[in-house]
Amino acid sequence: DQGVFGSFVPFQLLGSLAKSDPDGDSPLLPGLTNLQAALFFGTAPLFGATPIHYLAGVFDVDGLPTGLQYVPTGNFLDFLESAIVWQPTKFFLDYDEVLAGVDNPFDDNLAAVTIPVYNWGAAGGVGPYGTEMFGLLGSRDVAENLVSLHPPEEILLEFGHIDLFIAQNSPDLAWKPLLDWLNAHR
């Protein structure tokens, strides 16, 4: 009854430290500066064995992120500072089970979904993991826009989950196709 129901999300702290003391030592990732730590959390595949990442990075020869491809660093730090501080533990459990293919209740009733469905995502984000669910839907009006700008072997350079929302090119690559689909389904 006294279990852990939420986990700390360090985004606000990362953003604040990277803005106020970018070259200072990171308390969250020893050996990196505050700015490097923020960029690491934005660009690294942090979801286990999947290549899912938040933002497409620019990397040095050692693989450390030095910047972002589609988002000005200042915009990313602003995003971090406005992010949530806690996420429900159950969310991560359910999410991990879906990614791992563990039987769970989330796909039990997908055949009852008969409305039009649009899978909107980033090839370097969670988007590709929704594609396999299409075959479980009752709807036959299913469309997909997975923003992809790189070949599979460059997955860490690929458009990421948060790039969909804050990248400078997201209006044309992500939002316009969504608007067109919505207008076609009025």
Regions found by a protein language model. Give the residues of each.
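Hydrophobic, Leu/Ile/Phe/Ala-enriched alpha-helical segments that form helix-helix packing faces
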Residues: 110, 117, 133-138, 182-186
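Active-site-adjacent alpha-helix of alpha/beta-hydrolase-fold enzymes
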Residues: 112-113, 122-158
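Generic alpha-helical secondary structure signal
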Residues: 104, 108, 131, 169-176
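Catalytic active-site module of serine/aspartate enzymes centered on a nucleophile-bearing elbow/loop
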Residues: 143-186
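Short His-Asn-centered micro-motif
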Residues: 120-123, 167
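Alpha/beta-hydrolase
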Residues: 1-118, 125
